[in-house]
Amino acid sequence: MQKIKKGDKVVVLSGRDKGRTGEVLKMMPKEDRALVRGVNLVRRHQKQTPQAEGGIITKEAPIHVSNLALADPKDGKPTRVGFKIQEDGKKVRVAKRSGELIDG
């Protein structure tokens, strides 16, 4: 089970976007990277196509997961993630900072 998943709210720990929060749009587990909304924005030159207009566009670039921490559901601050097995045998993620369940 992964510590960070698609749809999670995360906080950037280091880099030029340090302190920013965003939602994980896509996980890339083989590269240990994540695409986060509004974080690590880069400008790209896009060639004109019949469907899309050309020009300089701004989009998110992948960021390494070591530079991300899950936002605590209680106060939004960065937290580490632990795992807990519930009575029904389901494995769930738990915020180490507050003890809150992250999923489930």
UniProtKB/Swiss-Prot annotation:
Keywords carried by this UniProt record: Ribonucleoprotein, Ribosomal protein, RNA-binding, rRNA-binding
Xref: Pfam families: KOW, ribosomal_L24
Record protein name field: Large ribosomal subunit protein uL24
Function: One of two assembly initiator proteins, it binds directly to the 5'-end of the 23S rRNA, where it nucleates assembly of the 50S subunit. One of the proteins that surrounds the polypeptide exit tunnel on the outside of the subunit.
GO CC terms, sorted: ribonucleoprotein complex; ribosome
Taxonomic source organism: Chelativorans sp. (strain BNC1)
Family: Belongs to the universal ribosomal protein uL24 family.
Keyword rRNA-binding: yes
